[in-house]
Amino acid sequence: MPERYAGLVPTISAARVFRTGYHDYCGPSPCLIRCGLYAPVTLRQAEPVALAEITCDTWLTEDGDGVVQVQLTWVGQADTPYAVSLADAHGTIVADASGTTAHGRQRLSLSVHQPERWYPWTHGTPTCYTLTVRAEKEAVSRLVGFRQIDISDRLLFRVNGMPVRMWGANLMHLDTLTNCYAPEKMARILDLAQLANCNMLRVWGEADKLPEAFYEECDRRGILLWQDFFLGCSLYSEEEDQLSLYRQEAEMLLRTRKHHPCIALWCGGNELYLAQEYQHPEAPVYGEKIIREVFPEVCARLDPHRLYYPSSPCGGSFANDPQCGDTHGYTHLWFVPGRAYPHFLSENCRVSTPTWQSMNQMMTPDELWEEGTYALTAHHPCEI
């Protein structure tokens, strides 16, 4: 590592090792590092042809018509017939196209006259359309939706011209032991979020990467997502080989997720400026080139219709300025009274307890009641 990073950029950040937030007080215990296979691995045979990648962009014209631009990358035999269709929520085909496969990338566009629009569940119906590509034995589908999201400099949101006040939470880890994604567990969390009237969730830059199934579930439910890139609370190497890795990561995330109507914005990461101000106030913001040059270039090139936000929090005279941009409510973790309500609170902390079974095994009966309130937090300080 170059000498200029010494004492500033942690080795784990310079090596670009993915780890979740188990390393400090923000992360849930126990402190474990995953290893081995924790998600499905598949082997596909391209016979005679297979779809290596499908990316979709959707937008609304000034007249209110919908456009779906599709990019297909094939492997296998060229000149194989394929068909693309777009079905509405009732299964009716509203647009289609066909062609023959070719090596490299192919682009095509579908138009829909006055499509039903996608809304967050608190303000309307989250109408989704299904895009399907078929060729021989191959069939791949993607959920898409049509909506216009406008976000002002003061983080005021309008969806399809309608002002929408955002209420939400940050997503933590589903399983601290296996790191495996469990659809039924995530469905329960999303149920609870909606019971709490949340219409936005933040995919935290230090949390786990989530699969396609999660984004489709948010599409169907009408839950908006603030999507961080996976940087968090650290300074980062700006060497060219590292910048190339960050560029590849961003391109992969956008190509595989940008078609989801639930994603409201891309954010450069979690607390990069805040980490510098708290930990190394006199040092350069190493990693700023990633969030100010690399990520915005990728977003402008691959997803120009969606807002890019540099880092959370940022926007004021200092990173966590509650009067401008977004802010993280660290003082709320200790329930400080009289705190002025911030402008846009994108992260907040609350203390939770373990399950009753765990507490009953590890604590005395006296500790489980009101006079032992402090013991609860001392045994398990974590955030939800």
Language model regions located:
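Short secondary-structure boundary/capping segments
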Residues: H280-V285, Q323, M359-M363
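Active-site mouth of glycoside hydrolases
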Residues: A6-S13, Y22, C31, I151-R158, ...
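Secreted/periplasmic carbohydrate-active enzymes, especially glycoside hydrolases
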Residues: M1-L201, R220, T327
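Short, acidic Gly/Pro/Ser/Thr-rich loop/turn segments
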Residues: Q77, Y273, V351-T353
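Substrate-binding clefts and catalytic carboxylate motifs of secreted carbohydrate-active enzymes
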Residues: I33-G36, W266, E297-C299, W334-I384
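Acidic, His- and aromatic-enriched active-site or binding-groove loops in soluble protein domains
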Residues: Q227-G232, T327-R339
